């Protein structure tokens, strides 16, 4: 109803499981058919796993194959767990080696892994850019989350994005309300992020990466499905008012 034609599926363990590798194949086909009937194209999948933990790599490899099944172009992951406790940590060089080992599978399935600005260790674009540059592959780029860099990294996204524009291939466009450390992520245009400045920076750099809307509300949640629908509609209106096609 809001006018979107593209969707980011989520296979994030313990948080949002739109789809998951252990779902019955028949159920995955039903979801695929549902997307087609509603003319929604799953161009990406959020498949967060701790890429520092060897025991979680097989889970992520399954998510890669699941993303390919749905015809996605991008798979999103934080370096550490997004919403579970980390069972392993590693320095940036170890992370680069671990992620580099995934490149053959990414190439096999024609996917780009976009690493999300998430968590205290990797909460800014500047930090992630160092890892992505070390990996040095077109198959591994940054998913820049505009609100996470405030919440986790304590930086201004307008300035931080300038440090990693060349490495950014995907953006979670998410607004930020309240204090920097408050879990408050409203509809676009309802918070205090200077999105026009971000759009100007992307345009000046010739960066036409896809924008994926993320709305996480407050710890109390949206309150109702109608409130979710309204937030999505408000975000769509905000983007179209700034010249974007949905």
Show where each model-derived region lies.
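Surface-exposed, active-site-proximal loop segments in enzymatic domains
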Residues: 15-24, 48-61, 81-91, 182-187, ...
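Histidine-acidic metal/acid-base catalytic patches
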Residues: 1-6, 33-38, 68-71, 122-144, ...
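Active-site anion-binding loops
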Residues: 14-32, 36-42, 97
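Active-site-proximal loop/turn and secondary-structure-junction residues that shape catalytic pockets
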Residues: 11-13, 48-51, 79-83, 119-121, ...
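Conserved beta-strand positions in the central sheet of alpha/beta enzyme cores
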Residues: 8, 44, 76, 114, ...
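Active-site acidic/histidine proton-transfer and metal-coordination neighborhood
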Residues: 1, 6, 29, 34-37, ...
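A short beta-strand-loop structural module common to alpha/beta enzyme folds
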Residues: 5-16
């Amino acid at each position: 109803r809001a006018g979107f034609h593209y969707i980011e599926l989520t296979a994030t363990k313990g948080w949002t499981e739109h789809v998951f590798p252990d779902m019955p194949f028949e159920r995955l086909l039903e979801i695929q058919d549902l997307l087609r009937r509603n003319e929604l194209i799953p161009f990406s999948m959020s498949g967060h796993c701790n890429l520092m933990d060897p025991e979680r790599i097989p889970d992520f490899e399954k998510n890669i194959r699941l993303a390919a099944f749905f015809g996605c172009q991008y798979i999103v992951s934080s370096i550490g767990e997004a919403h579970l406790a980390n069972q392993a940590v590693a320095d940036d060089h170890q992370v680069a080696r671990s992620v580099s080992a995934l490149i053959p599978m990414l190439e096999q399935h024609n996917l780009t892994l976009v690493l999300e600005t998430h968590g205290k260790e990797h909460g800014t674009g500047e930090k992630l850019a160092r890892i992505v540059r070390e990996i040095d592959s077109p198959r591994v780029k940054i998913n820049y989350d505009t609100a996470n860099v405030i919440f986790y990294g304590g930086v201004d996204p307008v300035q931080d994005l300038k440090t990693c524009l060349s490495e950014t291939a995907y953006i979670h466009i998410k607004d930020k309300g309240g204090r920097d450390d408050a879990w408050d992520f409203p509809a676009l245009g309802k918070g205090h992020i200077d999105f026009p400045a971000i759009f100007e920076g992307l345009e000046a750099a010739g960066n036409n990466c896809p924008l994926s809307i993320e709305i996480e509300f407050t710890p109390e949640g949206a309150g109702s499905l109608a409130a979710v629908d309204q937030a999505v509609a408000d975000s769509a209106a905000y983007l179209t008012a700034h010249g974007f096609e949905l």
